[in-house]
């Protein structure tokens, strides 16, 4: 196996429980969206996001009320729309900064990320959530501030997560051959795309025992990845 020089990790279902995203973050943003838009409609960033949402939704001349209904409909559909992601990220930022929200990170993931960072591995995040939201979840986590572990964050602006070209672009951005990058995710479609780009990849399956390591390869946790591959460790 080619030596690993960098690790790219997904968030939802990989470093973070699915329930945190769907049962904590999404409802938190939904409950506060109307008040946030009303209070910040004149903010340049918010106004731009609302305008982008209208254009994307085909309601260019709509007011804030109709735009709000569009955004709520996108939430119901779990649509990965850029303007929605930006607004959610801004709402979450307030929650994190006020101490109301804490990013939930699996303890094994936090321990491995710190170990790998200390070992000199370059660490990156690739998630459908916005870059800002990614920084918040790791920077204000229940495992402490993991932000210093990461060199960079990628969201869907670099491409779809099931498109192999996205992974090639991430490796190119890092200045590394894809074969020297290890990608971790719970999503088989993403794993397939990463491998098609030439990356090494391991499926994280949280339904398995923590130390499980199976053909695929598939691991029950980050600690299982460390035990099986010891990425970045000198021979």
UniProtKB/Swiss-Prot annotation:
Transmembrane segments: none
Pfam hit, one: Hydrolase
Annotated keywords: Amino-acid biosynthesis, Hydrolase, Magnesium, Metal-binding, Methionine biosynthesis
Cofactor binding notes: Binds 1 Mg(2+) ion per subunit.
CDD domains assigned to the protein according to its UniProt record, in alphabetical order: HAD_EP
Substrates-to-products reaction catalysed: 5-methylsulfanyl-2,3-dioxopentyl phosphate + H2O = 1,2-dihydroxy-5-(methylsulfanyl)pent-1-en-3-one + phosphate
Family matches, as InterPro entries: Enolase-ppase_E1, HAD-like_sf, HAD-SF_hydro_IA, HAD_sf
GO BP of this protein: L-methionine salvage from methylthioadenosine
Gene3D superfamilies: 1.10.720.60, HAD superfamily/HAD-like
EC top class named in words: hydrolase
EC identifiers of the protein: 3.1.3.77
GO MF annotation list: 2,3-diketo-5-methylthiopentyl-1-phosphate enolase activity; 2-hydroxy-3-keto-5-methylthiopentenyl-1-phosphate phosphatase activity; acireductone synthase activity; magnesium ion binding
NCBIfam families associated with the record: enolase-ppase, HAD-SF-IA-v1
HAMAP family assigned: Salvage_MtnC
Function: Bifunctional enzyme that catalyzes the enolization of 2,3-diketo-5-methylthiopentyl-1-phosphate (DK-MTP-1-P) into the intermediate 2-hydroxy-3-keto-5-methylthiopentenyl-1-phosphate (HK-MTPenyl-1-P), which is then dephosphorylated to form the acireductone 1,2-dihydroxy-3-keto-5-methylthiopentene (DHK-MTPene).
Protein name: Enolase-phosphatase E1
Native source species: Parvibaculum lavamentivorans (strain DS-1 / DSM 13023 / NCIMB 13966)
């Amino acid at each position: 196996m080619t030596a690993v020089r960098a690790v790219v990790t997904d968030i939802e279902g990989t470093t973070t429980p699915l329930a945190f995203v769907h049962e904590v973050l999404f409802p938190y943003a939904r409950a506060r969206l109307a008040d946030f838009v009303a209070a910040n409609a004149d903010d340049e960033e918010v106004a731009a996001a609302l305008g982008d949402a209208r254009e994307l939704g085909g309601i260019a001349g709509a007011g804030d009320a109709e735009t709000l209904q569009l955004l709520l409909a996108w939430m119901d559909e779990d649509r990965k729309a850029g303007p929605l992601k930006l607004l959610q990220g801004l709402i979450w930022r307030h929650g994190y900064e006020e101490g109301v929200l804490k990013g939930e990170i699996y303890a094994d993931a936090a321990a491995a990320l710190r170990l790998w960072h200390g070992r000199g591995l370059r660490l990156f995040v690739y998630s459908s959530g916005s870059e800002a939201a990614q920084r918040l979840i790791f920077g204000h986590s229940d495992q402490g501030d993991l932000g210093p572990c990461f060199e960079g964050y990628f969201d869907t602006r670099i491409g779809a997560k099931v498109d192999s070209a996205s992974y090639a672009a991430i490796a190119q951005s890092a200045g590394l051959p894809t074969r020297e990058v290890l990608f971790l995710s719970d999503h088989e479609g993403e794993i397939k795309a990463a491998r098609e780009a030439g990356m090494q990849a391991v499926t994280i399956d949280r339904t398995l025992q923590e130390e499980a390591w199976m053909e695929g390869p598939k691991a029950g946790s980050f600690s299982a990845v460390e035990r099986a591959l010891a990425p970045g460790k000198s021979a």
